[in-house]
Amino acid sequence: FPYTTLFRSQRVQGAIISAKKFPRDSNQAFARIMEACKRPSFAAVATFSYPRGNETVSGPSIRLAEVLVQNFGNMIAGVQELESQDGATIFRSYCWDLETNFTDEKIFRVPHTIRLKGGSMKPLTDPRDIYELVANMGARRKRGCILAVVPKDVSDAAVAKCRETLKRGTGEPIGDRIRNMVTLFNELGVNQEMVETRLGHKIDLTTADELVDLHGIYNAIRAKEAKRGDFFAFPEDEPSAAPEAQSPKAKNLTDLLKQKSAVKA
């Protein structure tokens, strides 16, 4: 679409000129990010947890990555669909620092399938299911690009501030916070006994630090970045690999299209 391409080109050129004319103040950008991380409602969705070996690791959620871009300034990040056919979608995720001209991009092929118990793959036919799968995978890749461009000390500080905000809470008694957390897990099919087994003690002994960790686990399961079986005793949920291990290896578009041509031939 020539008009769309022209519009995007003009928009990018305008953004580059603006970035050169109004460079970011790193101190102000950092302060804005820290201020956002002080909001309890945001902190509650800003991190997620995933299993890595025998450990549980926390990281920035997709929402936190988006806030980093918004507040760090003079950056463009997004996802662009390149091709969708033969039961798969090829798309590009990217993040570009307009001031330094540093960019990170990934081109991925996402098959329209889901993995069932036992390892078999089920093709998706419902357009809504396909859209949700592609959108979710695209958002994850965009997050990866953002975190590759935003300085790591900034993203680490944001995660730490969000954890601090969650730990402090809003003045609500910790007993009420524990009950609310149990209710959230119940909605995912995780009962109180399962949570207690993971914690290694009765639910009423849960500490503020453990509540923060449970928030990350809840966010990961809810966003389908992890399975219940990764953290709790769910025989029907096969444990999944960490997000990095689940991601297919990035390839350039030329290689992907060559692969497709070879298959057709």
Residue ranges of each PLM-predicted region?
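TRNA-recognition modules of translation machinery and tRNA-sensing kinases, especially anticodon-binding
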Residues: 17-18, 24, 31-34
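Single-stranded nucleic-acid nicking/binding segments centered on His-rich, glycine/basic loops
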Residues: 147-205, 212-214, 227-258
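Hydrophobic-cavity lipid-handling domains and compact docking modules
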Residues: 34-120
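Intrinsically disordered, compositionally biased tail regions
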Residues: 257-265
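Glycine-rich and polybasic anion-binding loops at the starts of cofactor/ligand-binding domains
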Residues: 8-12, 94, 101-179
